[in-house]
């Protein structure tokens, strides 16, 4: 008996030691994954549009013994982050000063100075621009609108509600069609003629991207002939098009107003007593405004001058054959107040934007049982519920259509909605879902394409596919055959989750000029991101 007790005690001790070692390992892993920032670290929250200078900034920091960290986000996302917690950052580099004015606590932002200038313009394939009479001619925004109204011009752009280029292009067009008033007011937004013109403008949208970088990638892979983007991005795109022996774009600078981004670098004054941080900021800002960086940025297609005339520019970058004339003055638009900008964005969502028909294909196979299905239900409720989605400007409007397809080994059920804002019933149906069977991502994708093929071209049409596993039923060949014979331009966006197959989803993305979003770090975040692409 004593011998048995002794064995039992020994076994318990070994288990406890093992548990303690495991706990120690886990603690170490957590520490390594989430290191605390040193107080000496100078952290910059920066627009994704500035990432081309990361290496130069960090190199400067190393040479001057400043430990610089840079975190990149979309411009409108930066506003949300700083509104919720600015204390994690020491400086902000954003595309346009208007977003600094949208902050709830503007007092923490000081010493803001423009680094470079980057207009947002429409660019059209040169042959199409020639056909429209846009070459070597002074063009007004109204003439662009007329080309769209007459069905002669369609274009792709970034999200108005989630990106800087989309928002500023919209505000510029709105301001111009309102007659370029000294101050754009709330009353002006209510004018029927203005709203009618803006609806016509957005009817020309062929596809929307949730970020500017993907917009360029999407254009290169797709069959489009016009785009709204940064001048610098369009210059880089044209260089790629020429390299691929494709037709470059012709940039159009309306004489009645262009959205100009001043790309300010500003200090975040979290602690006025911390003079060390301020000194580091001053050094970095002065470096960004130095002749060395100015020259480098000009080579990348950014302007270092605001309007006016500059003759000594690189003709390979600021190419006159692409419609770029650096000797002409650019008329900047007058941005309205914070209140009017907010009202204008809401007007766009509810009244102006081209309606969308989104088909969600949701995996309810057996591997989604438990936490996976629970997270899916929460994410879909967030996206579909008007009140919660509107907090992030992601809500569907009455004009939109939503279709839900659930699948496992086959297509399980299809839940359509007629009004995008009336989703209570479909949310209820989603929350009653149960898991069953294996995984087949191809058949529901084909079914989604069939639904959208029958939809009017008055809608932007998108498929969003969410899966947590490898497809062991259905065939990519069947999907490819159907797509190439019918759809051709409809994108399928995929959200990965669990052990989903990157290879299979990449095949679908390549076929449909789509994109893959990572849902493994949270489905809600992934659905929020993909929502901005439609």
How would you describe each model-predicted region?
Residues 181-253:
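Ligand-binding pocket segment of bilobal, Venus flytrap-like solute-binding proteins
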């Amino acid at each position: 008996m004593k011998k048995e007790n002794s064995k039992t005690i020994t076994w318990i001790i070994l288990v406890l030691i093992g548990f303690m070692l495991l706990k120690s390992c886990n603690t170490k892993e957590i520490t390594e994954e989430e290191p605390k920032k040193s107080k000496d670290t100078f952290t910059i929250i920066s627009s994704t549009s500035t990432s081309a200078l990361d290496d130069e900034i960090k190199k400067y920091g190393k040479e001057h013994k400043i430990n610089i960290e840079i975190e990149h986000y979309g411009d409108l996302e930066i506003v949300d982050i700083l509104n919720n917690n600015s204390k994690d950052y020491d400086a902000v580099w954003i595309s346009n000063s208007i977003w600094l004015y949208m902050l709830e606590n503007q007092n923490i932002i000081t010493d803001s100075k423009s680094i470079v200038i980057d207009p947002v313009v429409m660019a059209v394939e040169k042959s199409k621009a020639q056909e429209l009479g846009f070459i070597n001619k002074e063009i007004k925004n109204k003439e662009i609108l007329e080309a769209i109204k007459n069905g002669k011009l369609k274009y792709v752009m970034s999200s108005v509600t989630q990106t800087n280029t989309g928002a500023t292009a919209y505000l510029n067009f709105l301001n111009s069609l309102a007659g370029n008033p000294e101050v754009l007011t709330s009353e002006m937004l209510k004018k029927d003629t203005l709203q009618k013109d803006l609806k016509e403008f957005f009817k020309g949208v062929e596809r929307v991207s949730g970020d500017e970088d993907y917009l360029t990638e999407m254009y290169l892979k797709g069959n489009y002939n016009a785009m709204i983007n940064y001048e610098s991005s369009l210059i880089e795109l044209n260089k790629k098009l020429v390299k691929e022996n494709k037709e470059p774009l012709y940039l159009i600078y309306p004489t009645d107003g262009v959205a100009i981004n001043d790309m300010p670098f500003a200090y975040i004054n979290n602690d006025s007593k911390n003079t060390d941080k301020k000194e580091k900021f001053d050094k970095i800002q002065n470096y960004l405004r130095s002749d060395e960086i100015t020259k480098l940025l000009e080579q990348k297609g950014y302007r270092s001058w605001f309007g006016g005339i500059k003759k000594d520019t690189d003709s390979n970058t600021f190419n006159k054959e692409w419609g770029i004339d650096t000797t002409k003055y650019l008329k900047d638009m007058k941005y309205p107040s914070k209140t009017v900008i907010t009202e204008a964005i809401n007007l766009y969502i509810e009244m102006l934007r081209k309606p969308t028909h989104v088909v969600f294909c949701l995996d309810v196979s057996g591997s989604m049982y438990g936490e996976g299905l629970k997270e899916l239900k929460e994410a879909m409720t967030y996206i579909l519920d008007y009140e919660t989605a509107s907090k992030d400007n992601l809500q569907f409007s009455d004009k939109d259509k939503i279709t839900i397809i659930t699948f496992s080994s086959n297509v399980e059920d299809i839940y359509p909605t007629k009004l995008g804002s009336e989703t209570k019933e479909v949310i209820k149906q989603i929350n009653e879902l149960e898991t069953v069977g294996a995984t087949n991502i191809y058949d529901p994708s084909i079914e989604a394409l069939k639904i959208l093929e029958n939809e009017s071209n008055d809608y932007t049409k998108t498929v969003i596919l969410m899966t947590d596993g490898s497809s062991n039923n259905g065939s990519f060949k069947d999907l490819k055959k159907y797509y190439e014979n019918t759809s051709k331009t409809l994108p399928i966006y995929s959200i990965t989750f669990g052990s989903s197959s990157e290879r299979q989803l990449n095949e679908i993305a390549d076929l449909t000029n789509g994109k893959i979003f990572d849902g493994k770090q949270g489905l809600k975040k992934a659905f929020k991101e993909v929502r901005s692409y439609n």
